[in-house]
Structures are given as C-alpha cells and as structure tokens.
Amino acid sequence: MPQQIELRNIALQAAQPLVHGVSLTLQRGRVLALVGGSGSGKSLTCAATLGILPAGVRQTAGEILADGKAVYPCALRGIKIATIMQNPRSAFNPLHTMHTHARETCLALGKPADDATLTAAIEAVGLENAARVLKLYPFEMSGGMLQRMMIAMAVLCESPFIIADEPTTDLDVVAQARILDLLESIMQKQAPGMLLVTHDMGVVARLADDVAVMSQGKIVEQGDVETLFNAPKHTVTRSLVSAHLALYGMELAS
C-alpha cells in the first residue's frame, strides 16, 4: 500500500475554470487540513482525487501519484482511499439496511463480510447494540449515527488514506465532538493519511498536522499547523485565524 498520495497541478473546469493548479501531498500518519470558504474548490478537489467529478466538470490538467507513480483515480477509491462524506443521509440508499451497506462495501473490496467483522467495526465507532444498528434503515437513524456508520465503513475498508469532507457539518455540538474523537482515535490506532476538508479552524487546531488554505480555486498558503496559526501570511488565512481567535476573545498579532 502507498505511503504517499500526491495531487500535482490539478486543474478543473466547467463553463469556466474552477480549480487552478492545485498541488497537495498526503502522507501516512499525518492529517492535512484543506480549509477555505464555501465555493473555494475544496470538495471539487476531493472529487477529482476520487474520480467522481460532478456532471459538466472536467479535469483539464494535472495528475495523481501514489508513491511517485501516476495512477487513475478510480484505482484509489475504497482500496487506497476511504471516504467520509459531508452529508451521510444522502450517501446511504434509503431502501437498504446498514447490514446491506456494510456487507456490500466489504465484498466490493474483497474484505471479510461476516457479521463478526461488521459488528466489530460498528462497536469501534461507539454505536451501541450493533445487531440492532445493522437492521436499521437510514431514515431510522440520526445524523450523528449515520456519520458514525460512515466512519465504520471507512474502518472496514482498511484503506491507508481517508478523505473526510466536512465530517462535522450539520451535527450538533455533542455529535461533532464525538466524531472528532473518533477521527482522532483512528489516527492514533491506524495511522492513515487523512485529507480533512473543513471551514472550522477549531477542527484544524485539534486534528491537523499540516494546513492548505484554498481561495477561488487556488492554494494560497500551505504549511504546518503551528506556523499557520502563529504567523499566517495570506489575507484569507489571516481572516480565518482571526475569526477563530475572536471566539476566545483573542486577537492575531499584527
């Protein structure tokens, strides 16, 4: 399995250019946070990595490399990169139980799909009474439960990399904290490389090792989390850090 995934000069276009020459490097055991405002191109960059661009959007330049070798995005999905999506309710088939979702995921990747394996993954993400959870349909579960189930399926993939696209969006504060605890636990126990897409600098401060700031389809600043918080250079970065510090009655040094 690869130790590094590199996005090199990715450019995306629809009726007009959307993402301009984005380069990022994911490394096993490290969390790279991709931050920026809505519409900055974060989720499109993730979609390009997985080869699941929306209709009408095409990649016009760039490549993806695994340990220095060019690869097709479709060869990464599931096997090398697991995904935790922004809106879990739209990610599950409403006609299938959690057991069907989990089992199909395992079978598609050639992983064990026995009930003991599924139960262990569900228990690992803190969902109680795994036997009951496996019988539930998506509409019978809360947003927090569905997000935990999506993380359980990422665990089942046993992929060396994870893309987590706004994993705490639309969750209440308690559910957000539990999801962050889970992601932190996964990093400690399995040490995957993680691309964490978020607009919440509090999440960045807690989980990230490195940060890339995106604005208008471009990476405007990139560095380790400590440097970025203490000495942000770009206007967008300074605005993000300043807004975060203001929540705690603090100001960014000029």
UniProtKB/Swiss-Prot annotation:
Its EC number is 7.2.2.11. The keyword Nucleotide-binding applies. The keyword Membrane applies. One of its GO terms (cellular component) is plasma membrane. It is a peripheral membrane protein. It holds the Pfam family ABC_tran. It is found in: Cell inner membrane. ATP binds at residues 36-43. CDD domains: ABC_NikE_OppD_transporters (cd03257). Part of the ABC transporter complex NikABCDE involved in nickel import. Responsible for energy coupling to the transport system. This is Nickel import ATP-binding protein NikD. It comes from Shigella boydii serotype 4 (strain Sb227). The gene is nikD.
